[in-house]
Amino acid sequence: MIILETRSLKYSYPDGTAAVQDINIEIKKGKKVAFVGQNGSGKSTLFLLLNGTLKPQEGEILFHGVPFKYDSKSLREIRKSVGIVFQNSDDQIFAPTVYQDVAFGPANLGYSKERVDACVQSALEYVGLIRLKDRPPHHLSGGQKKRVAIAGVMAMEPEVIILDEPLSNLDPVGADEIMDLLNEFNHFGSTIIISTHDVDLAYRWSDYVFLMSNSKLIGQGTPAEVFKEQELLKKVGLRQPTTLEIYHEIERRGLAYGRNSPKTIPDLVNTLKPLDLMWVDVAPGVREGDNLNIGVMYGEYATQSPYEAINATVLHIHPNGRAIVELKRKGIKAGGVLLYDTDKYSPDEVRQIIKEGEIAFVGAMGKKSKTLAEQDGIRLDVTSGVIDKSILMALCGKRCLILTAGGMVDHALKRTREYVDKSGIEFTVGVVNRDGGCKWLEETEGSPEKLKT
């Protein structure tokens, strides 16, 4: 379903500078969309048009197929449904306290005092700032101000959230927290639209990319489609994403499997084609290209796990009856990624899981989970890029625990299971405290073994 659409959109500033020229786009509901381009390419002006802050001089914008109207009542409905977070949070935050700033939008929509309070409390809880609700915004850090601005938009319960350069002026930890929030909003159905000149962010995060230059739309498609066009990227002063650049170099050297375009470091690692050959005796009648079950290897013959089930493809058969085969290994006992929902948090339970589950690597996603771990002295090995780093550790046979909450639990579960399905590399994935019980599942030889507390 198309939620936002523009038709032949044009806008120029009073001095005659063309900011948006003949823009035609369709944005699907529930997608993560990135507008990519250098500063001055027209992204920010387009966002102000999509929110009804500016009115186009030509063309039209449609929300759920209905053209925008620019009377006061219609604009109020548009801005309730299509929220915008500016690049500079100071341009958006003006009230004496955090609570009052977040309450401004719902109050302006005519909500009752009780509903305004419920919306504000919920939004501040969601972004992890409820304890700062009475603090003046100018006393906050850059990352906290950004979260206040996001909470102000969230409190109006929009279907679409637009963010202009959402990670500008944020440190890596603050940036990771903002992206966790955006992923959670999207998980619950919100359409998320961002502008950025960071090609690495757009490539790994978005479902769909629009490429802008000199106030025009010059390309669009999936991240893999857009960022493979090296000549187009050079034309607008952008480079290929680092992960894709490394993959193409690996592919040119014949060291990569398949023709997928990896988005993340675990995806990239999974494309590597190891040289794993062996001489084996084969039975009469075996032909080149046949698949063989070699059995289980261990000790010095198992290179990735303590015990490995080995299948092999016959590459060449020698006249003496021996063959060169390419080995395909599968660890019988691999690591795993375990998720703990901190909405049901117990520090003693977490410590017991870490001890009895032999957890070697602990991460936390979201401000709430990080704060809980820190205040209770629970060791955190990683607080940014948590999902990818946990997958990499699981591939090395380590058991990992991710502390998170809300929609990020299902988001992390989905991301990790997608990796397992796509890569074909099996390791345990699950939520440890869902449905009232603590469970660590070791899926070995088809018989789950459960650790319960």
From Swiss-Prot:
Q: Give the record's membrane topology.
A: Peripheral membrane protein
Q: Where in the cell is it found?
A: Cell membrane
* One Gene Ontology term, aspect cellular component: ATP-binding cassette (ABC) transporter complex
Q: Which residue range or ranges hold the ABC transporter domain?
A: 4-239
Residues that hold ATP according to the record? 37-44
What are the protein's GO molecular function terms? ATP binding; ATP hydrolysis activity; ATPase-coupled transmembrane transporter activity
What InterPro entries does the record point to? AAA+_ATPase (IPR003593), ABC_transporter-like_ATP-bd (IPR003439), ABC_transporter-like_CS (IPR017871), ABC_transpr_CbiO/EcfA_su (IPR015856), Co_trans_ATP-bd (IPR005876), ECF_ABC_transporter_ATP-bd (IPR050095), P-loop_NTPase (IPR027417)
Entries under NCBIfam families matching the protein: cbiO (TIGR01166)
Tell me the function of this protein: Probably part of an ABC transporter complex. Responsible for energy coupling to the transport system.
Q: Which family does it belong to?
A: Belongs to the ABC transporter superfamily.
Q: List all disulphide bridges recorded for this chain.
A: none
Q: Which EC numbers does the record give?
A: 7.-.-.-
Any one GO biological process: cobalt ion transport
What name appears for this protein in its UniProt entry? Putative ABC transporter ATP-binding protein MM_0462
- Among the Pfam families in the record, one is ABC_tran
What are the alphabetically sorted keywords of the record? Answer: ATP-binding, Cell membrane, Membrane, Nucleotide-binding, Translocase, Transport
Question: Which SUPFAM superfamilies has this protein been placed in?
Answer: P-loop containing nucleoside triphosphate hydrolases
Q: Which Gene3D superfamilies match?
A: P-loop containing nucleotide triphosphate hydrolases
